[in-house]
A protein has these predicted regions:
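Extracellular/periplasmic catalytic domains that process cell-envelope and extracellular macromolecules
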Residues: 74, 105-108, 209-212
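A short beta-strand-turn-helix
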Residues: 61-77
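Short pre-active-site segment immediately N-terminal to redox-active cysteine/selenocysteine motifs
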Residues: 79, 84-87, 213
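Sequence contexts marking disulfide-bonded cysteines in secreted/extracellular proteins
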Residues: 72, 89-92, 188-190
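Surface-exposed, interaction-prone regions with an acidic/low-complexity signature
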Residues: 72-73, 112, 116-117, 218
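Ser/Thr/Pro/Gly-rich low-complexity linker/stalk segments immediately outside membranes or between
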Residues: 49-62
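C-terminal cap of thioredoxin/glutaredoxin-like
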Residues: 2-51, 174-240
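Structural alpha/beta surface segment adjacent to cysteine/selenocysteine redox centers
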Residues: 86, 92-169
Length: 240
């Protein structure tokens, strides 16, 4: 076989390998997307089974219609929405990287932020931590909305590892106390799961909207796929 024939054969083989690699990559991406949606659906299914579907969901008075906790001007023209799960490591990373940027923009009245806690990762703890933490966030908002941002930051600073029991209800109460919340009703709200059914209903609503992963960050309804501080500032400027 001539050298030229060998080179042609090698080139053809390399081309096939390249195509196979690209095909495998696309398949992996597709599988990952399906798994994200499936995991979210499983999370909601578990949450639904753990709630009393016949009981009316107690609705907090401090939230938006979609269950979001608004930080900043109630009438802001630019609103950043953050759909999050307190068990979600990527949510902790987002808070660490972009949380201060959002706080600064809220402080100078550039934006308001709607934090929307849902529970799609209950399966990642043995105590339905996602639901309990989301319930606690609503209890805190009802007790003292001004202290909610500090509590929110502390929750991610102390995020438990996946696969463990998660923080106990007493620990959730303690974090709220450390954030300066003194309400007498707070403890019973958290330990009694006052808003558990509401969390379940809002999680279902989020999934019905097509939200299948956390964090999902949007500016005036437009999703920011890589919500770094620079990307958020650019999206906010475009929305003004």
């Amino acid at each position: 076989v001539s050298n030229e024939s060998k080179k042609k054969a090698q080139a053809a083989a390399a081309g096939m390998q390249g195509k196979d690699k690209k095909r495998r990559t696309l398949i992996q991406i597709g599988i990952a997307a399906v798994l994200v949606a499936l995991i979210a659906a499983i999370g909601f299914s578990i949450a639904s089974k753990n709630s009393d579907s016949d009981a009316p969901a107690a609705a907090p008075s401090s939230t938006q219609d979609n269950g979001a906790i608004r930080i900043g001007d109630p009438n802001a023209s630019v609103v950043v929405s953050v759909v999050e799960d307190f068990q979600c490591p990527a949510c902790k990373q987002f808070e660490s990287i972009s949380g201060d940027t959002l706080a600064e923009l809220v402080a100078d009245n550039t934006i308001a932020v709607d934090y929307r806690p849902i529970a799609i990762l209950d399966r990642m703890s043995s105590t339905n931590y996602s639901t309990r933490a989301a319930n606690a966030s609503l209890c805190v908002a009802e007790a003292d909305a001004s202290a909610w941002p500090a509590w929110h930051k502390a929750m991610f600073d102390q995020q438990p590892a996946e696969g463990a029991a998660g923080l106990s209800d007493d620990e959730l109460v303690a974090i709220a106390r450390q954030a300066g919340i003194e309400s007498q009703e707070l403890s019973s709200c958290i330990t009694g799961g006052t808003y558990t059914d509401y969390v379940t209903s809002q999680t279902k609503a989020a999934l019905d909207e097509g939200i299948s992963s956390t964090p999902t960050v949007s500016v005036n309804g437009k999703v920011v796929s890589n919500p770094t501080p620079d990307a958020l500032r650019a999206a906010i400027t475009a929305a003004q």
